[in-house]
């Protein structure tokens, strides 16, 4: 099995402008992501951007860069443009690694690609990890996922799912039940190129719009998403200045 990694990198960010170029331990953040992805078993790692500043920095450290349109409405549309530019085959597998994940373990990149190759019923694969704290369970910025016993995603939501009705019917309950199966969705995906080609022809789905979750467009069109628990802990990405300082501290101690 072979696969490609595409790292989308946008310069504009409301909370952290110029995020991909932020310095972390002497390197721009996008370089850390690229180096982590290059430690996976990917056939090639490509940075996709619509910004000449990111292109120049990435090419300076030796990355392959594909320039994309600035008008894409979603990251998946951008990914599809890259696969078209590269001339990838319909059955090729592409892993989308976010450009703000400088601590992404290479093992999970391999895992999500391998899982898609092994589960032929699925057009997309992704990962999750357990939720242990009630605060995280209720946090709408932490996306929850439920799946069937074969790992087929049933739903993704910002709402707290599954809801332990009887547990919370008790007075003064402020913890999750023991061995509770809540899972946090980790935003790494592998796709079959054919799925990307179909995705860009679909209108936005109602549930996708309500939840502001792009993956719900896939489920709304009766395509299967495989979900598995990540084989390694995936530290959070960088969305804010506080996140940036946290990642810097972790890299200083050799994370």
UniProtKB/Swiss-Prot annotation:
InterPro entries of this UniProt entry?
A: Cytidylyl_trans, KdsB, Nucleotide-diphossugar_trans
Q: Which organism is it from?
A: Cellvibrio japonicus (strain Ueda107) (Pseudomonas fluorescens subsp. cellulosa)
Q: What name appears for this protein in its UniProt entry?
A: 3-deoxy-manno-octulosonate cytidylyltransferase
- Top-level taxon of the source organism: Bacteria
Where is it localised?
Cytoplasm
Quote the gene name from the UniProt entry: kdsB
Q: Which reaction does this chain catalyze? A: 3-deoxy-alpha-D-manno-oct-2-ulosonate + CTP = CMP-3-deoxy-beta-D-manno-octulosonate + diphosphate
**Known function:** Activates KDO (a required 8-carbon sugar) for incorporation into bacterial lipopolysaccharide in Gram-negative bacteria.
Name the predominant localization. cytoplasm
- HAMAP family found in the cross-reference section: KdsB
> What keywords appear on the UniProt entry?
Cytoplasm, Lipopolysaccharide biosynthesis, Nucleotidyltransferase, Transferase
Query: What Pfam families does the database record attribute to this sequence?
Result: CTP_transf_3
Which protein family is it in?
Belongs to the KdsB family.
Q: What is its EC number?
A: 2.7.7.38
Question: What processes in GO biological process is this protein linked to?
Answer: CMP-keto-3-deoxy-D-manno-octulosonic acid biosynthetic process; lipopolysaccharide biosynthetic process
User: What PANTHER family does the record tag this protein with?
Assistant: 3-DEOXY-MANNO-OCTULOSONATE CYTIDYLYLTRANSFERASE, 3-DEOXY-MANNO-OCTULOSONATE CYTIDYLYLTRANSFERASE, MITOCHONDRIAL
What GO CC annotations are associated with the protein?
cytosol
Q: What pathway, per the record?
A: Nucleotide-sugar biosynthesis; CMP-3-deoxy-D-manno-octulosonate biosynthesis; CMP-3-deoxy-D-manno-octulosonate from 3-deoxy-D-manno-octulosonate and CTP: step 1/1; Bacterial outer membrane biogenesis; lipopolysaccharide biosynthesis
NCBIfam families, per database record: kdsB, PRK05450.1-3, PRK05450.1-5, PRK13368.1
Task: State the Gene Ontology terms under molecular function.
Answer: 3-deoxy-manno-octulosonate cytidylyltransferase activity
